[in-house]
Amino acid sequence: MAPTLSADPADRIIVALDGMAPDQALRFAAHVDGLRWVKVGLELFVQAGPEVVAQLREQGLRVFLDLKFHDIPATMAGACRRAAALGAELITVHACAGSEALKAVKVAAEEGAQAAGQPAPTLLAVTVLTSWEEQRLQRELAIAQGIAERVPALAQLSATAGIGGCVCSPLEAAALRAQHPQPFALVTPGIRPRGAAVGDQARVMGPAEAIAAGASQLVIGRPISKAEDPSAAFAACCGDL
């Protein structure tokens, strides 16, 4: 199930703290007017440790812990149990870990959150990373399915296992929303406001278009975090919605 969101557009935008040192991330998050959600990825988590989740929550922020767990079921379950205890409201796992692992992490996350007195997080399954292009996926990983087939197949696998949503490119959001109505969460990176550089994302869309396509929440990084005025950039993205 998706996290509870208000009607405020600010609740729809998750700002990625990628590429920031811990102190920088905390200062940045504290000074973006109206910010509600932040994403903690691998780089920041490895550098700062689990404490960064608590520190961001102390600032009144909601945390998307994007560590993309992918391992054997027992290891994934243990990691999700501990991540849920931190109070992160969104946690990512790789759908291609398989149904056994997906079922295990759902149970473990609920147990970890309950033991720590935290609400159960929404688990998000990663389908196909937005940096992949179809030709590379087939050539380098020998996956015969095209992206248009693989993404919905992995989303269905995840939903059947009880996972609360998935991470997908905004280009796949409309098809997935037709397959999985609310409250199944669709969180979309690869969001680029008009005029923003595409960077290392291969499948991108604007904020308003992504929401119209069925996305629940949008992950936006550099167009806000690297802006001359991050508060103004965040407000502009909210205004687009």
Curated annotation (Swiss-Prot):
Q: State the oligomer form and interacting partners.
A: Homodimer.
Q: Which reaction does it catalyse?
A: orotidine 5'-phosphate + H(+) = UMP + CO2
Decide whether keyword Lyase is in the record: yes
Organism equals Synechococcus sp. (strain CC9605)
- State any single GO MF term: orotidine-5'-phosphate decarboxylase activity
Catalytic site residues?
68 (proton donor)
Alphabetical UniProt keywords: Decarboxylase, Lyase, Pyrimidine biosynthesis
This entry's Enzyme Commission designation comes to 4.1.1.23
| The encoding gene | pyrF
Does the record's keyword annotation contain Chloroplast? no
* Protein name (database record): Orotidine 5'-phosphate decarboxylase
